[in-house]
Amino acid sequence: MAIPLSLGSAASSAQTLNGGREPLTVDRLYDSPDLAGSSPRQLKLSPDGSRATFLVGRKENLHFYDLWQMDVVSGKVSMLLDASKLQQGELSDEEKARRERQRIYGEGIMEYAWADDGKALLIPSAGKLYYYTLADGKVRLLPTGDGFATDAKLSPKGHYVTFVAGQNLWLLTLANDKLTQLTKDGGGVIKNAMAEFVAQEEMGRMTGYWWAPDESAIAFNRVDESPVEEVTRNEIYADGIKLTQQRYPAAGTANVQIKLGVIALPQQTVTWIDLGQDTDFYLPRVKWLPDSRHLSFQWQSRNQQQLDLRVVDVHSSRAPQTLVAERNNIWINLNDDLHFLKQGGFLWTSERSGFKHIYRFAADGTVTQQLTHGDWTVDSISHVDEKQGWVYFTGRKDSDIEKQLYKVRFDGSEFTRLSTRHGMHQAVFADNKAVYLDYFDSLSQPPQVSLHDAEGKRLAWVEENAVKPGHPLYQYAGLWQLPEFGTLTAEDGQTLHYRLFKPVNFDAHKQYPVLVRVYGGPHAQMVVNSWSSQDYFTQYLLQQGIAVFQLDNRGSGHRGLRFEQVIYQHLAVAEVADQKQGVDYLRTLPWVDANKIAIYGHSYGGYMALMCKLKAPDYFKVAISGAPVTDWSLYDTHYTERYLGNPHDNAEGYRLSSVLPYIGSYQSGLLMYHGMADDNVLFENSTRVYKALQDDGKLFEMINYPGAKHSMRGNKVKTHLYKSLTDFLERQFKLHNH
């Protein structure tokens, strides 16, 4: 049963935005200036809360970023640092891979960090490090030796800069520019102070070292990649083939060996932490306690059904103490919400109730208070104000498809919603002042940034980004369609959210083809009231007379463990059933041409598009699959084993979750594409399907992009891709002149 939701409850009640009615072209979708307007990124508040700083792409080149600032008192916005003043150059292979893991794309200033005293900024650029002092506006190039500096950090009190170069950790003393190599054995299979591939790609841990708050020590991980199978990967570029040796831990194979050490300063002596007898584990998080004497780390079992928070006194020989022992017989999700309180104890989020909520623990690991409750999920802790006794966090209490900002007392009382507008809110707080930045967007509002007081009152716009004359979107806004939201009921009784975009100049007496845009994988949502550049292509299709439907199937994120974990040990069963249910609903609509329903997705969505096409060919006449996983034994350990278990224990689950057993059902109507230098979902995933279809004598279409990685970055690549997808759909649907 479909239950349409009022647009007024989740988005603007208008069907379109206000503005001009110029049609979109594929060439315009990802050209400069960005249709979203000025969308600041890397939002930060200075430690004293006096300045908001952020990166903004240039109008003539949206991927070249400068550093901007706003004076909190006066509201004046100005450029703080012109990135052209910094040396631009070729990135190292390690930095290219690190940015790909972070999904960062661009030039100019891509990251920066405030000094703790608020008087200076550290700015990495193309392997060089720059130190910018606000008092005189001078930029100083720091000495970093001959290597390419990555993962640079200012020490907590601002006396040092640390960075990784040549797979070793280096320390620069700012007072005298003395450069010290802290680790010596990095190189080859040994990586010091660097996060391994799966830590970056799957655990969200991009660093491999951590400063003690008082600058007395640095914790670091030492990674030995020798147990990991080395694969020779062909990165195919337009002008040649690059053979890359990559240590890639495929499901069921060996992971890295990891050690956790502490370097005492200034002595530079190393103490190794006891991580236990089991050597097959993950180290997803490391964090110092405020006293700089105790170090915490999270220890996760290989099967991801055990997650321990352990604490060790780095000045003692005693073994680490386990403060929290999370257990789940399916899997445990990671997060970044651990916060140690200066008054003792800590805050921790857990899904032990079935939904992610905030808990307060005493120093010995006993739960003293559950701060949030209910059948809804907390997204993340945004800020902890110990003086006033507040925890600020984002969550889905009021709607599964929106993210709001809330605060609650340490004792769970005075639960208060601070954000007011419907959409997605992300807050950035100042360390020492009761103000925050609200990064907000919705289907009808491209990203905007505002400054608020601790009660949620807006004090000033940092970037209002209103869609009005002069805004890049304005001339197209009059044709910008907003969707209808609704719900369906899955076969197990759980609620499924969908959104449906009707074509421009919709006529209920006509029939329209429909494209189902899918992701369908864990931790993600597509059916949300948010702005997304992925919707630009949707808007273009709506102007070509193609409706677009999206449904978040079971297994997707922010809905609790029962909703997510139904996929355990067998992928593309519940997910495909739910997408079929979405098509069943579409078939009830008189204006939908049931013979012209296509499905399109990328990455996990590409996998879903293939599985829906092959397992339900009567539902999906056409499929477009981008960079799909097609055989889960080819994908990495941490992600794959979380959902399918170890292939040695679940061989049948792996086989039936693969695309290849279903190839025989294919008849026609498939387009596949893949980046030929993809180091995440390896190109081999697609070539295996190509070969199987060719061996069966089945006709299909494919586009392979030389030099492209998994994210398909770059305007030229995207423009060619979306022109190709449009042409394919128009031919399959027999639209226009095809």
What name fits each language-model region?
Residues 3-7, 11-435, 443-445, 451-452, ...:
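Beta-propeller folds
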